[in-house]
């Protein structure tokens, strides 16, 4: 029996069935853009931990910084006893984030946590409940972020009901016959039939729709959303968990637009393979 097959048998016996796998190959070593399985076969890694390894596997600068932190403090909980690297990274992100005014950063662990906290901040700031997301968008697998996600299969089947006050408009996609005008009409209809704008806390959108087909948000839609936000006191959340950290040629995908978001979520390649989001 191969090492992969043996590990697969152990995996079936020990790991919950709800954890899916794209392959039955087990990673034992990785370097740069290559990864080796338990049987010694070498592969080019186009998955990158699902958009996490933008700097490649085991980048020496990333490895050195991880070791430096392990040699100092592994964990103290920033809310109990703060530490400088948290502040240092926040300062670096604040310098680079395409946000009007003074930017500030908080860190959590996963992309879904980042999105949940962005929604919490938007609701607390505006004192409104509603959030409008878009068809095809993906925002995470917690209950709230599944509610925001604009795809039923494969994520949402069997997990409802989802939180209230979440609404969806179609995302403009030429292959689906949906234009920017159609999307804006959907939003107008939501305002007319489902939730008045004075009860909407935020729009949340990916600058590049990921799980919905890797489709960039048209600039005219981003400008229209910014205008609606400014008109009605709504916040614009750019979910950059997948699109951030130079995956589009700029550090943030929002840098391709001539408008700015109020909140930006980050994760994945933010930490070169370590669990960190903000």
Language-model segments: which ranges?
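Conserved N-terminal phosphate-binding loop of PLP-dependent enzymes in the Aspartate aminotransferase
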Residues: 1-278
């Amino acid at each position: 029996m191969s090492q992969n097959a043996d590990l697969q048998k152990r995996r079936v016996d020990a790991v919950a069935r709800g954890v899916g796998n794209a392959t039955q190959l087990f990673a034992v070593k990785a370097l740069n853009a290559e990864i080796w399985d338990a049987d010694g076969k070498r592969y080019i890694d186009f998955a990158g931990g699902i958009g996490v390894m933008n700097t490649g596997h085991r980048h020496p600068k990333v490895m050195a910084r991880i070791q430096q932190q392990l040699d100092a403090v592994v964990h103290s909980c920033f809310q109990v006893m703060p530490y400088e690297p948290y502040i240092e990274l926040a300062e670096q992100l604040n310098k680079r984030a395409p946000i009007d005014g003074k930017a500030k950063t908080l860190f959590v662990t996963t992309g879904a946590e980042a999105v949940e906290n962005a929604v919490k901040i938007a609701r607390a700031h505006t004192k409104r409940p509603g959030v409008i997301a878009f068809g095809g968008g993906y925002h995470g697998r917690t209950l709230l972020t599944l509610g925001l996600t604009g795809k039923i299969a494969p994520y949402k089947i069997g997990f409802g009901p989802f939180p209230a006050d979440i609404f969806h408009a179609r995302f403009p996609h030429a292959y689906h016959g949906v234009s920017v005008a159609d999307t804006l009409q959907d939003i107008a209809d939501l305002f007319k039939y489902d939730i008045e704008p004075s009860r909407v806390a935020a729009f949340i959108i990916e600058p590049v729709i990921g799980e919905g087909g890797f489709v960039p948000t048209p600039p005219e839609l981003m400008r229209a959303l910014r205008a609606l936000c400014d008109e009605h006191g709504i916040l614009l959340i750019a979910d950059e968990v997948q699109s951030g950290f130079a995956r589009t040629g700029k550090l943030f995908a929002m840098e391709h637009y001539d408008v700015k978001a109020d909140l930006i979520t980050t994760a994945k390649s933010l930490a070169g393979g370590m669990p960190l989001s903000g």
